[in-house]
């Protein structure tokens, strides 16, 4: 009977299972996010979380232990230099499994597994963007720049309508002619062509 045996063998012999989990753990460390089946993701979570906890120690012995799982220097460097300092204060739970639905070919339940502190979608929404607005302040300071935060404010359309002045009968010579045509409205360009 199979009572109390919780370990998922993933229908593979031990060496194949070890290689699979090692390769997926390397991909997770290098790319911060992988797409796999839910069963493999749950097995990978049990495999990779103790490795990340070991990486928080940052000793030579810890590096050698982690290298014994990966057999590759690149994910070990990335884990100790970038990932471990970022998750140093987190007491476990370094990965997140997001279910994506079923795969078309075999109807396997798919998911996206990612490192928790590396969710780029949430970070982009949280960070305010800084944009540069070009201003012109006289002849001496052409192209002076000022930084403006990108807070979304709705401009008053009535003020813009009263401030806008139509461009009529502009006399332009040489290379500036194309720029003047680009700034005019389509109705004004039709009048000039006639």
Swiss-Prot record:
Keywords: Ribonucleoprotein, Ribosomal protein
Keyword tRNA-binding: no
Record-level GO cellular component terms: cytosolic large ribosomal subunit
Gene3D superfamilies: Ribosomal protein L17
Polar residues bias: start-end ranges: 144-161, 181-194
InterPro entries in the cross-refs: Ribosomal_bL17, Ribosomal_bL17_CS, Ribosomal_bL17_sf
A Pfam family the protein falls into: Ribosomal_L17
Subunit structure: Part of the 50S ribosomal subunit. Contacts protein L32.
Record-linked HAMAP family: Ribosomal_bL17
Similarity comment: Belongs to the bacterial ribosomal protein bL17 family.
Name this polypeptide is given: Large ribosomal subunit protein bL17
